[in-house]
From Swiss-Prot:
Family: Belongs to the Antp homeobox family. Deformed subfamily.
Record Pfam families: Homeodomain (PF00046)
One GO BP annotation of this record: spleen development
Protein species of origin: Bos taurus
Lineage: Eukaryota, Metazoa, Chordata, Craniata, Vertebrata
Region spans: Disordered: 1-134, 219-251
Key words of the record: Developmental protein, DNA-binding, Homeobox, Nucleus, Phosphoprotein, Transcription, Transcription regulation
Biased composition (Pro residues): 71-97, 241-251
Annotated protein name in UniProt: Homeobox protein Hox-B4
InterPro entries found in the cross-reference section: Antp_homeobox_Deformed_sf, HD, HD_metazoa, Homeobox_antennapedia, Homeobox_Antennapedia_CS, Homeobox_CS, Homeodomain-like_sf
Entry function: Sequence-specific transcription factor which is part of a developmental regulatory system that provides cells with specific positional identities on the anterior-posterior axis.
DNA-binding region: 162-221
């Protein structure tokens, strides 16, 4: 209403439009409209409703964009809820200190942990107590359980081991023992001690080596063994009285 009154009271000049043929030739407007279509332009301006026109246009554009737009990836699904606790157990809430208590500082907490005494190395089982504390003591090693390395025997070795393995002599030790056996097949105690210190062996090892070497020397030279005595030699030398040379008795 205000628009119509403004147009009537004001000195409005009606614009001069060119004929419709020029618009149709210049492709501004289609030629199927009559000249009377443009004559009522003033009346259309008063009855124009922009809200309705914009509403229809927005609906068309929304439908067109919705049809042309590519479907995007589906939204991520929310994570599944955590499983409920078993019926026998109830979730434990963190213990909260009382309001009046003071929390210890980190330094004091570390000192308290470090000052605690360590647990004993061998704790006794209350179900099976052992009065002798055999688990805490070191295992007892008896002489027969030790392994004797005879190749590196201490020269001050005094014996006492009930069981020994075979001695592996080196080439230098065997050469020195062969030289000594070539000159003396029997050794004195003093000479045996000297050879044992020189070859880093024990007196027992020197003694056993010379005994074995003498047995081998007698076997090579086919000499009788002096340690084995035959019991028939004494009986053949002389018979009982009255039987000379073991013959029948004289009548």
């Amino acid at each position: 209403m205000a628009m119509s009154s403004f147009l009537i009271n004001s000195n409005y000049v009606d614009p001069k439009f060119p004929p419709c043929e020029e618009y149709s030739q210049s492709d501004y407007l289609p030629s199927d409209h009559s000249p009377g279509y443009y004559a009522g332009g003033q009346r259309r301006e008063s009855s124009f409703q922009p809200e309705a026109g914009f509403g229809r246009r927005s609906a068309c554009t929304v439908q067109r964009y919705a049809a042309c737009r590519d479907p995007g990836p589906p939204p991520p699904q929310p994570p599944p809820p955590p499983p409920p606790p078993p019926p026998g157990l109830s979730p434990r809430a963190p213990a909260q200190p009382p309001s009046g208590a003071l929390l210890p500082e980190p330094g004091q907490r570390c000192e308290a942990i470090s000052s605690s005494p360590p647990p004993p190395p061998c704790a006794q089982n209350p179900l099976h107590p052992s009065p002798s504390h055999s688990a805490c003591k070191e295992p007892v090693v008896y002489p027969w359980m030790r392994k004797v390395h005879v190749s590196t025997v201490n020269p001050n070795y005094a014996g006492g081991e009930p069981k020994r393995s075979r001695t592996a002599y080196t080439r230098q030790q065997v050469l020195e023992l062969e030289k000594e056996f070539h000159y003396n097949r029997y050794l004195t105690r003093r000479r045996r001690v000297e050879i044992a210190h020189a070859l880093c062996l024990s007196e027992r090892q020197i003694k056993i080596w010379f005994q074995n070497r003498r047995m081998k020397w007698k076997k090579d030279h086919k000499l009788p063994n002096t340690k084995i005595r035959s019991g028939g030699t004494a009986g053949s030398a002389g018979g009982p009285p009255g039987r000379p040379n073991g013959g029948p008795p004289a009548l």
